[in-house]
Amino acid sequence: FYSKLDKFHRPRQIFKHVLGTSVNDDMLIFSEKDETFTCGISLTSDEKFFIISTSDHITTEDYFFPSDTKDIKPILFKERKKDVRYSIDSWKGYFYVHTNENARDYKILRCKTDSINSLEVFIPSKKETVVGSLDFLDDYMIRGEKADAIPKLLIRNIKTNEEEEIKISSEPI
């Protein structure tokens, strides 16, 4: 997969290329219509889905499709809403959503990958704490947080919901 740039040199289209074929045969799988938005494509942590992310400076929208499909039809995860940012990842049958919707300093939602309209709060927003990005390893979700300018790492067992904090520093950054 690759993105093509528009006349303003911004990525606005996603194409699929099959090795050994001409680029003239490449298939357009996504085209961003809003000139203020750009797009890109990535693979989820469990490599089960491709995510097409489109965004401007304050708003995002994601589409997904299974990584093992030949019939590519990107599915809208959640319609864009002005000033709402979100990103999705998948791990062990769930989509995890890092978003600022109704959460100035972000929160993490999740839903089963086959039930995207059934989002539940997994990590709530926290007063005066920025809930940062997340990564996955085996049965664990690793995320960063920052409170009073002091960063910390949290490791959560996604089966038991037990969580452990790893202190990085007691000094503000």
What are these regions (language model features)?
Residues F1-I173:
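Peripheral, non-catalytic segments that deliver or gate enzyme domains
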